[in-house]
Amino acid sequence: MADYLKTEGFAHYNDFSLPHLGPLFLLDSRVGYCRENCDIATYVMRAVGIPISMDFYEIAPSYNRKHFWSALIDTTHLVVPFNYEEEPMSRKPRPNERKRGKVYRICYGVQPERIKGIFEDKCVPPLFRHPFLKDVTNEYFPDSRVTVELDRTSKDGKAYLSIFSIGQLRAIAITEVKGNRADFDFVEPDVSYFPSCMIEGKNVSAGYAFTLKNNAPDYFIPDTTSLVDVTLYRKYPMRSNVKNLGNTCGLKIEGADTYDFMKPELLYEVVDTPKVNYNILKVNPKKKYRYIRYSAPKDKFIELAEWRMYAENISQPITPQNITADHPLSELHRKNLDLMDDNDWVSFYMSEVVGEQLIFDLGKPYKLDHILFMPRNDDNFIHLGDSYELFYHAGAQGWISLGKRMAEDTELHYDNVPEGALLWLHNYTRGEEERAFYMKQGKQVFL
């Protein structure tokens, strides 16, 4: 049934903010975000007697968004999570599967209070006051539990298990404090968490962050007596950027005297995946050329965020007189050529066909010196000219600053980082996608 639903298609669109839509509308209009996708599966499968639910996590351990998926209620008392648009159903965990942390399900009946009086306690985050919300993490991780040490507690006697997202702690589980400890049942292993509590209406750190391994917390405890040098390239996990950058391997840049490129000179070839988005390609042509050709690999689309060519002894980029392709461009694609030179590092030109060649007519011959080349990316690399601040997590003290930096290159350097610390790089200039990370063998490892 899931395979059949996939053949009927679904258009992903994240800008909706609507209540659940009815089955007749969704069966006719297959559009929405992950929740609508799950609603379709629920309507169809329940109609033919297949017991499924829709589960979700409120805060993602690895992303900034809430996420829904379908869950088949199995005879093993565990669920089989799936999304019919993504991959076939499987009981086996998938590689690179999204981390969940804690899993919840909206039910039709009022659920028992986790803590007596919690539904009426306005000091508790709304997630835990939802009377129809059920914690079903036990159906995913039935044997995973953790006891954490608390260096700070609140007067209400409650503690939270939190995820650090968009610059703040977001609670995903609640429990009652026992002395200076807190027990949390059914939490996903190999995920990093922050113990926290409510102080004056704000969710604040109550101890050291940790990764759950073998039902025990592996704490990030910074050693302030041992400082190390670090080099930072990003503020957020790579995700699909690895693929986007890798798609440029094999592209060629050539120069020629004539539009037909009867006698081209190879100026540059990308032979390895770029490490960052902002790349200066030094070229050393034998002579001046009027025409420059950008050739994508035969099996790849052009996905180009920024492209500027600079001639010797000229500080301003060359403005091409005309840009054409090796095939007729549609009106939309001709218009989108401007995205390669709009100073927006997220927008990008995407070719209509794989293996496309773009030809830049410079108007007259120039001897090129270098090219600014920026593939499609998420702009979470170090952005030149932006203001950054690096923090380390100090348990109940929260985040401690290690200093501000103005980015003058594609990397930031700090020589005062406590060994073993959990870090957070904040960009004051733009964006909200930021995640905590630690250093391992000189490289950033994001949580």
Describe every region a protein language model picked out.
Residues 1-4, 15-24, 29-123:
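Hydrophobic/aromatic-rich core segments of domains that either
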Residues 76, 165-167, 201, 257-259, ...:
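Solvent-exposed strand-loop boundary residues in beta-sheet-rich modules
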Residues 80-269, 273-287, 362-363, 412, ...:
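Alpha-helical and coiled-coil interaction segments, frequently adjacent to or embedded
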Residues 158, 190, 384-387, 420, ...:
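Glycine-centered loop/turn motifs
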Residues 159-164, 253, 307, 371, ...:
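Hydrophobic beta-strand segments
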Residues 224-288, 300-370, 374-383, 431-447:
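Disordered, acidic Ser/Thr/Pro-rich linker "stalks" and the adjacent N-terminal cap
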Residues 294-300, 425-432:
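Short beta-strand-plus-loop segments that form exposed binding edges in beta-rich domains
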Residues 407-410:
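Short coil/turn segments at the loop-to-beta-strand junctions that recur within blades
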